[in-house]
Amino acid sequence: MISGVPDRWKVVASSLSSNLDASYPTSSSLSTEPIDTRSSSPQGSASTPVDKEKIIRGPVDYLLKCPGKDIRRKLMQAFNEWLRIPEDRLNIIAEIVGLLHTASLLIDDIQDSSKLRRGIPVAHSIFGVAQTINSANYAYFAAQEKLRELNRPKAYEIFTEELLRLHRGQGMDLYWRDSLTCPTEEEYIEMISNKTGGLFRLAIKLMQLESEVTSDFLGLVDLLGVIFQIRDDYQNLQSDLYSKNKGFCEDLTEGKFSFLIIHSINSNPGNQQLLNILRQRSEEESVKKYAVEYIRSTGSFAYCQDRLASFLHEAKMMVNVLEDNVGFSKGIYDILAFLL
């Protein structure tokens, strides 16, 4: 107690402290699941602690209610046919990866000025940019907090390493776009290995902490991440379903150097048309259709298909080697079939 303070002030201070403590959830009470609003409310408080949690998580929960392909969960289930970790541990890791993936999508959509995600308006067009950034950052730390449930000290090292790699990859992707610098194919593959492969690796590394199986799966995981992103690049310029979910040829509007765009530019460096289209960030369908035809004229769609076929063949060879050590996984073949 501070001497010389009137008793009535001490009573007020004590009351304020109690109200503040009651207004926010403790770290142990935070959930990674969407929380429903409660009708009751403490006297003198405009909203309950769970109301505040719901507000903070609003953009995250908005996107979670419209699930995507859930390829990361399917990948984890496929690898678990080899790793054989308990279902409750798998679910914890899946929640961690799900939160991180959702957070990264929220930030990506802001950085890319996207209009649609999974066929609905992007979160920041509903909640605003500031609230969406805060919700995404909150989800990163909610995922980190959930690591405690694994009770594996090395999990924190894995978490930090892969999030750093993810942000390094994203940083280079943004730099190339904003400086209109076309990378080489090798630089692009390194970038997507960091960015897209990051959460794939994080999931499998955390699963390996829970498993007695010691085989090295990371080469296959890295390759699957590369295949997934290059396939995504192809569909962005080719798929009607992709256009419905994210917009027609969104990579061109974003000014993004995707796998096909990089090949097309590098196949004829003297022709600046595609670079100029990327610079414009055009939303005009006629301009984007012209760009797609130019990309086709440089053989970039055919080249992308050939590279994907080569990568998939390499992945199948890796699976064959792993099967000699850890047995058959139907889920892995389902993943490979999905990526065809």
Swiss-Prot record:
Cofactor annotation remark: Binds 3 Mg(2+) ions per subunit.
Gene that specifies this protein: atmG
Highest taxon, organism lineage: Eukaryota
Name under which the protein is recorded: Geranylgeranyl pyrophosphate synthase atmG
Positions of the record's site feature: Important for determining product chain length: 140
E.C. number(s) listed in UniProt: 2.5.1.-, 2.5.1.1, 2.5.1.29, 2.5.1.10
Binding site for isopentenyl diphosphate: 69, 72, 101, 118
Reactions accelerated catalytically: isopentenyl diphosphate + dimethylallyl diphosphate = (2E)-geranyl diphosphate + diphosphate; isopentenyl diphosphate + (2E)-geranyl diphosphate = (2E,6E)-farnesyl diphosphate + diphosphate; isopentenyl diphosphate + (2E,6E)-farnesyl diphosphate = (2E,6E,10E)-geranylgeranyl diphosphate + diphosphate
Binding site for dimethylallyl diphosphate: 117, 195-196, 229, 236, 246, 256
Record keywords, A-Z: Isoprene biosynthesis, Magnesium, Metal-binding, Transferase
Known cofactor(s): Mg(2+)
InterPro entries in UniProt: Isoprenoid_synthase_dom_sf, Polyprenyl_synt, Polyprenyl_synt_CS
Keyword Membrane: no
Keyword Transferase annotated: yes
CDD domains found in the cross-reference section: Trans_IPPS_HT
EC primary class: transferase
Highest classification ranks of the organism: Eukaryota, Fungi, Dikarya, Ascomycota, Pezizomycotina
UniProt binding sites for Mg(2+) 2: 108, 112
Task performed by this protein: Geranylgeranyl pyrophosphate synthase; part of the ATM1 gene cluster that mediates the biosynthesis of aflatrem, a tremorgenic mycotoxin with acute neurotoxic effects. Synthesis of geranylgeranyl diphosphate (GGPP) by AtmG (a GGPP synthase) precedes condensation of GGPP with indole 3-glycerol phosphate, followed by epoxidation and cyclization by AtmM (a FAD-dependent monooxygenase) and AtmC (a prenyltransferase) to produce paspaline. AtmB is also essential for paspaline production, but its exact role has not been identified yet.
GO terms, biological process: alcohol biosynthetic process; isoprenoid biosynthetic process; mycotoxin biosynthetic process
Chain residues that bind Mg(2+) 3: 232
Bias type Polar residues, positions: 19-48
Family of the protein in this entry: Belongs to the FPP/GGPP synthase family.
Disordered: region residues: 19-51
